[in-house]
């Protein structure tokens, strides 16, 4: 680099250091993209901009990557380490210098042809200042989406320097290009052309399509044939004028539609960045690259997260924005449309949805058409398939209405492929968890409002870590092609279609999405420590026992991972325990022997929420441990047989991904891991307990204890009264569970949750154990109950069976009474 250029860079660097604070995407490109800092890199930038180059240089030096401003020398040949695809405009538009990118690509390819050992990494990098997509109807493109001259760039850096990012893309091996495609000038031209297309798609993925003018959007919706027909029906059914019906339609659009504002997003990003840094010790994001690739490939993206907290709305938009993606339009419950939250959420992309559409055809038509318009325009959308926040920490049964509308939007004949992206959201502290416990105990849900929001904000402190894991995407077109090959026959651009295959397909997709959410779960210090302490009947463990138990969980999750998308802490058991203690949820008592970790009684109910977040990850090893402890010695084949009978119930309740065919192999691998940890012994083809490690094995088995007790309750009632109807079975099961929780100190609110028993009874019906005519397959029911009865304590079994007998006698006396009356 010449002396004059060094001086120029130093002078330009001074204001950039003050004005620019860029975020690197992905956060660690060396690890996430597989960049090799020891090998030479050719950085490819879209525009000729020294500000972009110096911004990139600062980030490269911080990441330990080669300096893009330094020349690359090899065998006496010196070439620049960066290339601009477009030389860019100048203040005087008529002066356009000759492009150098094709020549430089050709020089690099030539160098590879002459030197077989050389392998330069070509890395596309885009530097963006600001991400406003602009409004429809504005003819002038927004500055950062086109090539800027020097003056425009100066003002972009001045105004948007702290809203900028440096986006690294996956490297391309020039050795591979030279070997596979040759080194002539046509390949160099092709590289430049592909790079130009790459950057164009990347910009669109980062900023999204232009935002609509709200009134013009409403006018377009009113002109749609579906809404015109719904307005006519409204006027006729309510006997009002057409103008009044149209005013009703506009009022509903005002209630529903978002009013997205880039400036509001920028401002909220500043506020949230400040807030997260003070409330959270870190936000952990995994697998975001798969979503960035979908956006870049032109997919319409529907984000489908689990719903833990009202914080989800803000956290997900914040994470997506910082991953270089457009914040989505979010379907938010109408209960959040209160001042001042409602207007703020609306400006950040929220559109509001009522709890039910029943009895309001105009509302359902407008909502469906609005959602279809969002997809048609290319906006990403986010909705919570569970319908509401989980009060138990587990995934809820999915509500399928919005998903059905998503598929109906595809049936309008759009060309953009729509892909569902499941997201696992996890926290070490959920601010509403105390309220959830009260609601599960029967308290009335408090209505959202300004004062409740203020009270909630006062509780925000020491929230630990947050986790956002992007699961495996589900492309709807691919899914429908595989499962409903004739789906395109139902395409109609005007009328909303409800083909016969829609309802079962939507149900299957929704269950698949819930499974994929659980496949990307995040284990953390809080849910692992809660699992260990709640496994102890006294809710207390010595520090040594706690560390040993955490080690057991960590080894299981690392050696036999539930799924490739789950995340497991890299910290040791001791480090996780120290972090959990810093959250002030547990107490430590010291005596002459050592420390005792205690979960206070008032905290125990709340901690079940965090345990339930990851219960599905450990339920099978827990079940193996429980069976071996009861039998003392048992063959693996018998363990597999017993679990295979119980597994369908667990699979439905916890959205487990293993098929029945995969189950034996998975159980064998888990059993081998327990033997490896010396929790079990393997002798003469049998599994047996290892007495020195029995305490750890007992704590592991306790993870499934309450689940087995619940199953035993329902199956005991079925054994006692095979003709009991589904509604009564659910009600009696809940009543007995409440009784059991009082008599045996079961301190988990979800133990008698209505939704849990509803799912259980529905699964028994699906598996053929009961029918719609309220008949039970008695032999099968008794076989499963005998297995469950052996795995619960004699005291609990006695309580269940005596209560079942009482329920049976009551049912018989009621039947006799009804017969007498007849």
From Swiss-Prot:
Per UniProt, the short sequence motif HXXXXD motif occupies residue numbers: 306-311
Q: What is its EC number?
A: 2.3.1.15
Give the main localization category. membrane
Sequence segments annotated as region (Disordered): 803-822
Reaction(s) catalysed by this chain's protein: sn-glycerol 3-phosphate + an acyl-CoA = a 1-acyl-sn-glycero-3-phosphate + CoA
User: Where is it located?
Assistant: Cell inner membrane
* GO terms, molecular function: glycerol-3-phosphate O-acyltransferase activity
Q: Give a GO cellular-component term.
A: plasma membrane
Kindly tell me the pathway this chain contributes to.
Answer: Phospholipid metabolism; CDP-diacylglycerol biosynthesis; CDP-diacylglycerol from sn-glycerol 3-phosphate: step 1/3
What does the UniProt entry state concerning the protein's domains? The HXXXXD motif is essential for acyltransferase activity and may constitute the binding site for the phosphate moiety of the glycerol-3-phosphate.
From the Swiss-Prot or TrEMBL record, give the protein name: Glycerol-3-phosphate acyltransferase
Q: Please tell me the species this chain comes from.
A: Pectobacterium carotovorum subsp. carotovorum (strain PC1)
Q: Give the gene that encodes this protein.
A: plsB
